[in-house]
A protein has these predicted regions:
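Bacterial N-terminal signal peptides
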Residues: 5-16
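A short beta-strand-turn-helix
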Residues: 20-35
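Short active-site neighborhood of thiol/selenol oxidoreductases, capturing the structured segment around
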Residues: 31-45
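Loop/turn elements at helix/coil->beta-strand transitions in domains of secreted/extracellular proteins
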Residues: 33-36, 67-70, 103-104, 112
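Solvent-exposed loop/turn segments at secondary-structure junctions
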Residues: 43-47, 76-81, 114-116, 124
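Typically the conserved alpha-helix immediately C-terminal to a functionally engaged Cys/Sec
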Residues: 49-64
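Thiol-based oxidoreductase modules, predominantly thioredoxin-like and allied folds used
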Residues: 64-90
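Non-catalytic, surface beta->alpha helical segment in thiol-disulfide oxidoreductase systems
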Residues: 98, 102-125
């Protein structure tokens, strides 16, 4: 393998490592000045996997939004416990319903306080 090929291979590996970095936990009550992008998902959603792999992972890997946006997921495959923005207990399903995250994938754009910043985006663009 020549040096150019080796360099490209190393670059791809480093981008893949960054892209595969985990999402932040949905700790909505934790104060932070960054807005949230929340993907409403469920385990059997192939379009969720596509959205994550083709759009969200590259956005996180770019580092361009690191100081502006927190990315997370809310799984509505089961009503799992979740701490809401005000510190109260809710479930993932109740949380998603409140923000009109009825189907998967749905992207929610929320302020650090839980206010809606833009209408939900349904499906894969």
């Amino acid at each position: 393998m020549n040096w150019i090929g080796l360099s490209l291979f190393a670059a791809v590996l480093s981008v893949e490592a960054l892209a595969a970095s985990p999402l932040e936990d949905p700790e909505f009550a934790t104060r932070d000045s960054r807005n949230w992008v929340v993907m409403v998902t469920q385990p059997t959603c192939s379009f969720c996997t596509r959205l994550e792999n083709e759009i969200l992972q590259p956005l996180r890997a770019s580092g361009q939004f690191e100081h502006q946006v927190r990315f997370t997921t809310v799984d509505i495959g089961a009503a799992s416990p979740l701490v809401d923005f005000d510190g109260s207990s809710t479930t993932t399903i109740q949380f998603a319903d409140r923000y009109q995250g009825f189907g998967t994938p749905t992207l929610l754009f929320l302020s650090p306080e839980g206010d809606v910043l833009a209408p939900p985006k349904f499906g894969v663009p």
